[in-house]
Amino acid sequence: RMEPVDSLERNAETGRFLVRTPSAAYDAAAVIVSAGAQPRKAGFVGEERYAGHGVSYCATCDGMFYRGKQVFVIGGGNSAAEEALFLTRFASKVTVVVRKDHLRAQASVVSELERSEKVELRLMTSIVELGGGELPSSITFRDNATGETHVETYEEGSFGVFVLVGRVPESGLLRGLVELDESGYAVTDE
């Protein structure tokens, strides 16, 4: 039987757990939590509106939908850099948008990006808005050094935006039960 969990409590005296679901409460000696993590949002205007319709959070899942199209990858870490390289298999052009003046990814991956003819790096840049109709057709960029913005327009549906800025753990049920780090991940000994 599978149900969503509403709450998880631990009895301080017995050490046992009480798991509450919409239909019942279960007493357990141990609980295994495998809630995973959700993609972190970039926070630009239009991100939610176009999620699944021009905005994606997984290059290996959705990259093939952008065969022959331009894609923008938001992020400067290893995942963003590696997925940007993966997207060069499908996309006509991959523009990596990094809010800082450098990528945090491993030097070897950054070097590969810099050597690729399909990749453009836009450092000190953020996407602040995605606009359009049913599918996106414009991107507003901000120069993070000057604060100036400019809009680039494209044919509707001719590009995609991949948001690869980290993940947020689904650890809400664990708050107060186990030690969590500043990002919300359970602290373990290994």
Language-model segments: residues:
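FAD-site-proximal beta/loop scaffold in flavoenzymes
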Residues: 38, 43, 49-65, 164-190
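Redox-cofactor binding/interface segments in oxidoreductases and associated redox assembly factors
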Residues: 33-34, 73, 159, 163-164
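Nucleotide donor/acceptor-binding cores
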Residues: 29-30, 53, 68-70
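Generic hydrophobic/aromatic pocket-lining and core-packing "Φ" positions
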Residues: 84-85
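Glycine-rich Rossmann-fold phosphate-binding loop(s) that bind the pyrophosphate
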Residues: 75-77
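N-terminal Rossmann-fold NAD(P) dinucleotide-binding loop
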Residues: 80-81
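A Rossmann-like FAD-binding core segment of flavoenzymes
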Residues: 3-21, 25-28, 89-189
